[in-house]
Amino acid sequence: MAAMASTAFAPSVSSTTNKLFDSSFHGAPMSPSLLRLQPIKSSRPNNLSISASASPPYDLNTFKFDPIKESIVSREMTRRYMTDMITYADTDVVVVGAGSAGLSCAYELSKNPNIQIAIIEQSVSPGGGAWLGGQLFSAMVVRKPAHIFLDELGIDYDEQDNYVVIKHAALFTSTIMSKLLARPNVKLFNAVAAEDLIVKGGRVGGVVTNWALVSMNHDTQSCMDPNVMEAKVVVSSCGHDGPFGATGVKRLKSIGMIEEVPGMKALDMNSAEDAIVRLTREVVPGMIVTGMEVAEIDGAPRMGPTFGAMMISGQKAAHLALKSLGQPNALDGTYVGGVHPELILAAADSAETADA
């Protein structure tokens, strides 16, 4: 069901308006001295001081761990996990898919301490495709104004006229995960698949879950019944089509709740990212679709290796969920506190199919 925390410490600079060099986007040659890009924008001052002679706070020659019984380790893991399963068996929001859209959605939701969020991720490693940029390269490109979200997370980047570049995509994914999972109202269930939906009276009311390895082997074994997780709102962020992709909307089609899943169209970055954010919505009662799964249900273009729409689509999905729950949100003007400019841009309710 994949949709798709350490922060980079780099030299900070003064103004967001200063440019290190004129963008070479249109082919202008760069000076050799500028071929090694340096960050020209940092979200916070760099107060880190590292000494090469610093030693660990213990003697590495005589180090020994405190003793422990093996059964204690087993009990600690089992007790805590089972407690989480009991706690989140009936929850406010289930986010299916922990890619960049799903993580951004859960992060935004978790700011409200009254909302309980469960994240279901079929992979052992959450993050979806957001551990790398395009073609397995390292850098992550984010178009403005989505960089405001990166500022909130405290992630450094190189700033250009209309976009920013994080030196490694893993910095975004690890940072948002570490901040998100530290919050008391969030639980990530990774290596867990959402096999089906709970539907009552025409409304999605939760998900049917199973261990991911069990879900992948139903053809080889029998009698491996699932479990369930009820939720007031389900956010489907299962990514584009694939073995575990777009499974939320594909299931809606198979049970007759939507008419078709036309699939995403050919790549067009400019129209794709705007369309993904604009078309993020509650597609059937109780189920919100976000991220690249939006392109699958609406026939919007694919965006390729740019990630801003994933973040802002996730944020919009969170505020749609808050609205559904009767909580303050940025879409109807009831949100308390500062609202990101990009969320105002994302507040359109139009469900118009994108024209590729």
Swiss-Prot record:
Keyword Iron recorded: yes
SUPFAM superfamilies: FAD/NAD(P)-binding domain
Transit peptide extent on chain: 1-51
Positions where 2,3-didehydroalanine (Cys) occurs in the chain: C223
Binding site for substrate: A101, E121, Q122, G129, A194, D225, H240, M292, R302, M303, G304
InterPro entries per the UniProt record, alphabetical: FAD/NAD-bd_sf, Sti35, Thi4_fam
Cofactor note: Binds 1 Fe cation per subunit.
Pfam family, one: Thi4
Task performed by this protein: Involved in biosynthesis of the thiamine precursor thiazole. Catalyzes the conversion of NAD and glycine to adenosine diphosphate 5-(2-hydroxyethyl)-4-methylthiazole-2-carboxylic acid (ADT), an adenylated thiazole intermediate. The reaction includes an iron-dependent sulfide transfer from a conserved cysteine residue of the protein to a thiazole intermediate. The enzyme can only undergo a single turnover, which suggests it is a suicide enzyme. May have additional roles in adaptation to various stress conditions and in DNA damage tolerance.
The protein, known as: Thiamine thiazole synthase, chloroplastic
Organism classification: Eukaryota, Viridiplantae, Streptophyta, Embryophyta, Tracheophyta
Gene: THI1
